[in-house]
């Protein structure tokens, strides 16, 4: 026994020694080098943060709403996605009496029209998710399903077609055909998710047929009223298995027989997926983000569909690491910690490198979609949006530290019109408590520049522009425990009662803290100049853990 104890003690000492050396080593030599070459250009990039989504228009969230001038998300958000806005329960069904099955055409589109008008007034365009079938159109309909909406197809597809056509006509009458043609339309949310839609039988194959039929009737109603150029598509789960394989629908659009017209195929302009990791530190049980999107794109390419755009209609993180009084879900599907900045940056890098059009967000501000202080997600999104119109530039990692589970990476682009080089880099580990700085060196080869100096504008997104670390300290000071929250306290939308629910704590937040956090969340650029030597520009930075840096580099003449 004595020998055994001695061996254990020796082993423990060795482990502790090397653990100390390992951690010290990371801090000392966590170094990376990148080469950017703007003579090697690829695809034209688009703004990856152009979409936001909202769960419901109940309560008219866009009627009479004014732009937040200080933190205006509509400087980069182009579309507001209204999820399942034309059916599924009494709040979403657009009728005078959603429960009266004796009258099937007592339409009342006032709520939809007024909210669309409000969205346009904010400088954005509506993206309307259609497809959920009104209660009175399905004999088996129930509001007791998982999402509180009817999951079954219509009993009579012609009645449903007339409803969608009437909605389209009302929108054209109110806003004009040219305006509505600039909007986007979708048919269902996660169409192969049985919690959103399925056949009455629940059979996978029958459910696929019913959805394809629903899609065809919906799209044709839009075409017949708005025109053949209407922008319409569909949103699948993809990241995890649904009731049936989404490729059945993709193949139907490419070469199947249209259930409404009898012709070959169906109009489709975009395909979207959902992508959720479970929580910080726990990735999805399904495909990672890049594999999810490649799966969707490959399926469309194999089916022969061309010219589509690909996006993500909802996602990021389902749950936080701490639980509120009733749930650990994240209201905005993001956390307030600076970890989220690097998480978002690596998503945008994947999008730029794989020609993914957009990743829709639930919120960018502490008070909801329109109001409040900027989160780190806002700062990353607003800077990533500046890549819009630039061409992807060759970015090579020429040196990297050999430490596991740490991801330090970069992406760059060159805008030929503005003659600007854009670079984004991040220091990420899938751990909210990650604590190691990364030393990053860049060598930029920009033959387009004919100058001796360049102006470098750097935006560093770290704890210094994040109110959430101060919020954690203030929670301790004021005794605001996890039981003061309904859902996860890790969510940055403190202004929502779904997040911070205790009234006494809300009074402290709004009366004493929110104004202070305005200063804590400001992102100030740092402007400097760098020399051009032998056609190259060299930059370096020590990037804090979980932080992100954006560079904008222009000529000084």
For each of these PLM feature ranges, what is it?
Residues 52-54, 82, 187, 234-235, ...:
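Conserved beta-strand positions
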Residues 403-483, 487-492, 546-549:
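Carbohydrate-binding surface patches
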Residues 75-282:
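Substrate-binding cleft and catalytic face of glycoside hydrolase catalytic domains
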Residues 53-67, 104-109, 193-197, 237-251, ...:
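Acidic-and-aromatic substrate-binding clefts and catalytic sites of carbohydrate-active enzymes
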Residues 481-557:
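C-terminal beta-strand-rich structural cap/linker in extracellular carbohydrate-active enzymes
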Residues 278-367, 372-388, 416, 431, ...:
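Catalytic-core region of carbohydrate-active enzymes that cleave or remodel glycosidic bonds
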Residues 2-13:
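Sec-dependent signal peptide recognition
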